[in-house]
Amino acid sequence: GVDAIILADPGLMEYAKTKHPQLRLHLSVQGSATNYEAINFYHEQFGIQRAVLPRVLAMPQIEHVVKNTPVEIEVFGFGGLCVMVEGRCALSAYVTGDSPNTVGVCSPGKAVRYEQTAQGMETRLNGVLIDRFAESEKTGYPTLCKGRFEVNDETYYAIEEPTSLNTLELLPKLMEIGVKAIKIEGRQRSPAYVAQVTKVWREAIDSALRNRQNFSVREAWMAELNKVSEGNMHTLGAYYRPWK
């Protein structure tokens, strides 16, 4: 009863296409396909019917991809914010020795440590200090690209702050440009997290489908999403903001 298989490995795609031609194949975000030429290649070679875009594309770029491929396009709507091209980030592998493409996550739970010190709550990844939070600050999950580091004698978030991607306000626009599905991050998340976020997004999508022109984000939705947002902060990520 499986609806589709999500794959990133070309060898597995070829095997699935040959041995199970009736099976619907989706290209994983780990396939790092950021343009329509790459997506069309996977479609022509392996029959991919849907592709999940990495979280580094702006809205005009997403629209350009949608217009130039017969493949359904899926984008991330809520969850962790990855500022790298998924499948190609070497930061976490450098610190933990585990590649995101082989272990499935960029900060494996086994490498994560929280320690209360006199200076504040410290978060470490494989022993490396990633951040230190004051009592008044919300403690984020230790991800290397969201660490607070000393650069030119200043300590700050050099790449990105601990925050969650939330594109709820973009729903009408995503529908308008032809995006076919919204992806909610579930990897390293609890069933309760997935249920809570999915419930909010189901209500929002149904509301937008009924009346896209007058769609507005409800306070109750944001209140629920705030409970599971990293650092209680939201961002539109690359959709409407260039990286530093």
Describe these PLM feature segments.
Residues N35-E37:
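Conserved nucleotide-cofactor-binding alpha/beta core module
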Residues T18, N40-F41:
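Long, charged N-terminal interaction/targeting segments
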Residues H43-E44, M175:
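Non-catalytic positions within long, well-ordered alpha-helices that form the structural scaffold/packing
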Residues G47-I48:
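As written
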Residues V56:
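Contiguous mid-protein beta-loop-alpha structural module that forms a pocket-lining wall or clamp
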Residues G1-A33, V52, P60-A181, R187-K244:
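Active-site pocket-lining/capping segments in soluble small-molecule metabolic enzymes
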